[in-house]
Amino acid sequence: MAAWGERLAGVRGVLLDISGVLYDGGEGGGAAIAGSVEAVARLKRSRLKVRFCTNESQKSRADLVGLLRRLGFDVSEGEVTAPAPAACLILKQRGLRPHLLVHDGVRSEFDQIDTSNPNCVVIADAGEGFSYQNMNKAFQVLMELENPVLFSLGKGRYYKETSGLMLDVGPYMKALEYACGIEAEVVGKPSPEFFKSALQEMGVEAHEAIMIGDDIVGDVGGAQRYGMRALQVRTGKFRPSDEHHPEVKADGYVDNLAEAVDLLLQHADK
């Protein structure tokens, strides 16, 4: 692998995943990952542009930012690219009325959306809401439509909380795809449109940006396919087998966000 200076040269913007990179969710809101609060502060004091890019779909953007601030992070709503607001924009543009299979914590993001007589389904990480009854209702709505449309806020397989690994929205999305014989439209990582909007909001080109995440497929693979560079942290959902993934190879592997920031401040924007 090339030297760090070569791999990080010309980076002007940094996209940060949140869960598994900044903090691990769980009881009482979860816990910041060691060194991550100061790492974010150091990045923001540098010349590099910083944006937070998350597939979080159990909390509204306001609630997520509130949690991060309580954990000590310097972050504002305007710095966060999240899938629920992006999905609302798509629904309005296309005149769609969703049946929502989402967590109560994110439902407020859809307050301005008409959900009467639904002509599509939006699925997110509903947690305990993924009951047979709720999954079957989403299935029935889709099967009654002539042209069924399913939106999924991300398609992650699992994520890490302080109590252990938790199933993400992806397995439930796949179940509805299989049952209905359709393919979901993913809003969130690894969708190219999601990375595009985050970079536009940050004001940098793909080749000038780097993604830092714990998901080898959604964060690293998605960013690289869009023309960005990507580092994987060995925190959150990281597993040692990720470093030998058959299809995705990160531009570098670091122990945590603090190490990534050390390297970026040493080598980026040169």
Swiss-Prot record:
CDD domains: HAD_PPase. Keywords: Cytoplasm, Hydrolase, Magnesium, Metal-binding, Nucleus. Substrate binds at D17, I18, S19, T54, N55, K189. It is found in: Cytoplasm; Nucleus. Detected in liver (at protein level). GO terms for molecular function: inorganic diphosphate phosphatase activity; metal ion binding; phosphatase activity. Binds 1 Mg(2+) ion per subunit. One of its GO terms (biological process) is phosphate-containing compound metabolic process. Its EC number is 3.1.3.-, 3.6.1.1. It is an enzyme of class 3 (hydrolase). Its cofactor is Mg(2+). One of its GO terms (cellular component) is cytoplasm. Mg(2+) binds at D17, S19, D214. NCBIfam families: HAD-SF-IIA (TIGR01460), HAD-SF-IIA-hyp3 (TIGR01458). Belongs to the HAD-like hydrolase superfamily. PANTHER family: 4-NITROPHENYLPHOSPHATASE-RELATED, PHOSPHOLYSINE PHOSPHOHISTIDINE INORGANIC PYROPHOSPHATE PHOSPHATASE. Phosphatase that hydrolyzes imidodiphosphate, 3-phosphohistidine and 6-phospholysine. Has broad substrate specificity and can also hydrolyze inorganic diphosphate, but with lower efficiency. This is Phospholysine phosphohistidine inorganic pyrophosphate phosphatase. It comes from Bos taurus (Bovine). The lineage of its organism: Eukaryota, Metazoa, Chordata, Craniata, Vertebrata.
